[in-house]
Amino acid sequence: GRKMGEHTKHSTSRVELRERIILAAVELFTTNGIKSITMDEIAASLGISKRTLYEVFPDKETLLEECILKSQKDGDIFVKGVIETSSNVLEVLLRCYQWSIERFHATNKKFFEDIKKYPKAYQLMKNNRNRSSEDTVNFFKEGVKQGIFRDDVNFAIINLLVRDQLDLLMN
């Protein structure tokens, strides 16, 4: 029979396994693109069986969606840290912009081509980009209040420029 406390141990290791799979998949997808990476390779890179992988994630698209969500969560945590440690809005914008460019350069161009073939994951990514655009506009407005930017700066235009840059990079 099952010993006491065995079940709880199993469920925490399950959560850890899920995290490990997502981390490995993020790394593999961003480095190589999505299409070229198989569930077999993800399992092999973790030293787990394919069956174990499929028990946690039924298919590649579900795993990809979780990867996107994980990246967004990491992004939110990063931005929060930047806000807490920056002396003004301009510094926040520069540090975040630099970080997004670094992240972009660390990502294989194929990733951005491949993700369009996964509608739900692609939508998640686009929603997040729209959200960070709104955040950017709010930051510029805050910057005007702090007297860092002139108030005749057109936020929407600046924001579109920043976004177009990222869109150009991603396409």
Predicted stretch roles:
Residues 47-57:
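Short hydrophobic/aromatic patch on the recognition helix
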Residues 66, 77-106, 159-162:
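Hydrophobic alpha-helical connector segments
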Residues 24, 28, 52, 99, ...:
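Amphipathic alpha-helical interface segments
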Residues 14, 18, 64, 68, ...:
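Amphipathic, non-transmembrane alpha-helical scaffold segments
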Residues 1-32, 36-45, 62-65:
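Basic, helix-initiating cap at the start of DNA-binding domains
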Residues 98-138, 148, 156-157:
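Short secondary-structure transition hinges
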Residues 150-171:
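Hydrophobic alpha-helical segments that form the core
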